[in-house]
Amino acid sequence: FDADVEGFGVNKPGDAIWYVQTVAVPGAEKCSADLYKDMPRSKAHIYDDLMARHWNYWDEGRYRHLFIAALTDGKAAEGVDIVGADAAWDVPTAPYFDTAEIAWSNAGDRLAYTCKPLAGTDYALSTDSDIFVYDRASGRTVNICKPMEGRVRFNAMVHRNTPFPGYDKYPVWSPDDRYIAFRSMATPGYEADKERLMRYDCRTAEITDLTPSFDYHATNVAWADDRTLWFIAPMEGTYQLCRLALPAPDATCGTVDLPKVVTSGDHDINAFTMAGGRIVAEVTTMRMATEQFEVDPADGKLTQLSAVNKEIYDHIRLGTVEKRWVETTDGKRMLTWVVLPPDFDPAKKYPTLLFCEGGPQSVVSQAWSYRWNFALMASQGYVVVAPNRRGVPSFGQEWLEQISGDYSGQNIRDYLSAIDDVAREPWCDRDRLGCVGASYGGYSVYFLAGCHQKRFKAFIAHCGIFNFESMYGQTEELFFINHDYGGAYWEKDNPTAMRSYANSPHKFVDRWDTPILIVTGEYDFRIPYTQSLEAFTAARLHGIPARL
């Protein structure tokens, strides 16, 4: 190959390989050295449309493309760019470039993949990715989500009536190659929508929603046989393994059985593999980094297979994790994890941290984080309070969706309900409460700094949103902010958007009265570092002790 290979997969017959390479797309040049050959040392970037940058990189007119090459005696022939040499988009999709979005059929004659074939402003406004299938024999590609010819320019009114206008990703072939299972979001522009489990019939081109009455995401999908699917779902602050018996090919959505939740317990199943009727899964808890467990497919019993970190655990002290259900201001029950320090003594008093989750649509689960690690925080003598406030998945769609357009509302009250509930404990030192969070959690910290009514003695905000108006012009995936804020700041007749911007944290800095630590990084293009600079400047000019 004439360039680096960034992922590959050999088909089962062993006669073909797909691979991913970054290619320069003619007409999409953004770097001055590419545009002006007589200026090879120039370093300017030139843009006439969105998106200039994405996640953590600038658009330089180079895209990841998917190639297929024949294999003979283990050697690859010249590859064919099945995306198209002039296609200014990525396969697998940006910004994570996950090669799990690419899947060979078991016969090795077809390749399914995810693509979002949009560019410019359309790309920034839309989540409309689709599943494509390339046939090796004919060289023909079919969009199984939109069988009509061509595509329309992004328009909210048009896409509302377009099949599959949201994210469609992660195709997985059934063992007999008749079906493709994939994950799909129904709402255009809503990146945190319910991940439905869909089944495409390659014979009839019919698509069936397999989880219409299941109120949770379906992720990490795998076939056990032609009539059984397994997947992972977030369930009440954990991730569990589920099994779904499939309907007959001519069944309608109304005859689909609910998935069976096979595993249970306070753990996260993060990934799994199946072979010979056995299941091996990666499992974490707040007290255990990833280990391998065998899962009994009948009753979900977990049997630990690996103990990679046993020698380390034998020499450190870990605190305990308690599950607490807190009553919210609107009479709901909210799961809150409480992490206690090692050698916890209820007769003593402990400084306590309120943890604010990012996302905002991310569950506070039994994850082992290598960044925001609750066990590490607790090891320093803190109690950590981690509520699953409004807006997180695993508690049903109503709980998840409430936060959209209401960043400053019920979820903020949920945070205060959690810390107030724990603060009533005699071992909680109410004079030493802190509040910490990253991303949306950083926004939460900034907002709470203006309304906490002297509950907290210190705040830590990591890459948080401070100023909604400047954020709208600085971020890149505008579909996200359009959905979560309700629209742009100039939409004066849009009450949801106007309510969001009226409650931006920067408008309440005059109420700040508590020291704050602000952490940021220049390669965060989702919430640029300028948000942190604005917050730091505002804090210091208001006389608030602050560190950046």
Question: What is each stretch, according to the model?
Answer:
Residues T22-A85, T99, T114-P117, T121-F132, ...:
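Predominantly five- to eight-bladed beta-propeller fold
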Residues L71-K75, D135-G139, D201-A205, A245-P249, ...:
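Short loop/turn segments that connect beta-strands within beta-propeller blades
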Residues T22, K116, T284, F355-G359, ...:
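Glycine-rich His-Gly loop
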Residues N373, A378-S379, A386-L548:
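Active-site-proximal cap/loop segments of hydrolase catalytic domains
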Residues F1-V20, A52-D59, H65-L66, A85-T114, ...:
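Conserved beta-propeller blade repeats
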Residues A77-G84, V142-P147, T208-P212, T252-T263, ...:
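Beta-propeller fold detector
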Residues A119, K301, A307-D431, A438-S439, ...:
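Cap/lid segment of the alpha/beta-hydrolase catalytic domain
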